């Protein structure tokens, strides 16, 4: 499996993070990862094909929102919650509040 590059959050402007969350599928992925656990894409059903989900996860990774880690033939993902909260204080808590309100 190829080496996956994760950007430093210091390099990511807030508009890129917000733009990445502009898709209902990507927002659903982030909400699912708010549990703080490591998941693989097959853990969830977002109503899209695997290739489409991979595309959405790539956008989230490039925006610094998720961490992808290869594990054999799987690719595990988790939310970069601590880093996001350090860069954008209160951001994760607001996502949790908004997620609970829906």
Protein language model annotation of sequence segments:
Residues 1-14, 31-35, 80-102:
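Amphipathic alpha-helical dimerization/coiled-coil segments
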Residues 3, 19, 53, 68-69, ...:
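A broad, low-amplitude sensor of folded, mature protein cores
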Residues 6, 15, 39, 55-56:
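Histidine (H) residue identity feature
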Residues 15-49, 71-83:
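N-terminal helix-turn-helix DNA-binding core of bacterial DNA-binding proteins
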Residues 22, 31, 37, 57, ...:
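Generic low-complexity, intrinsically disordered sequence content enriched
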Residues 42-63:
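Canonical helix-turn-helix DNA-binding module
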Residues 62-71:
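A short, conserved structural fragment
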């Amino acid at each position: 499996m190829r080496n996956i590059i994760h950007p430093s959050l210091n390099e990511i402007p807030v508009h890129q993070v917000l733009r990445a969350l502009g898709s209902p599928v990507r927002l659903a992925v982030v909400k699912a990862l708010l549990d703080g656990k490591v998941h693989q894409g097959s853990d969830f059903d977002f109503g899209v094909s695997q290739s489409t989900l991979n595309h959405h996860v790539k956008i989230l990774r490039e925006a610094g929102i998720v961490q992808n880690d290869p594990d054999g033939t799987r690719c595990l993902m988790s939310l970069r919650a601590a880093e996001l909260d350090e860069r954008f204080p209160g951001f994760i808590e607001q996502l949790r509040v908004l997620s609970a309100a829906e």
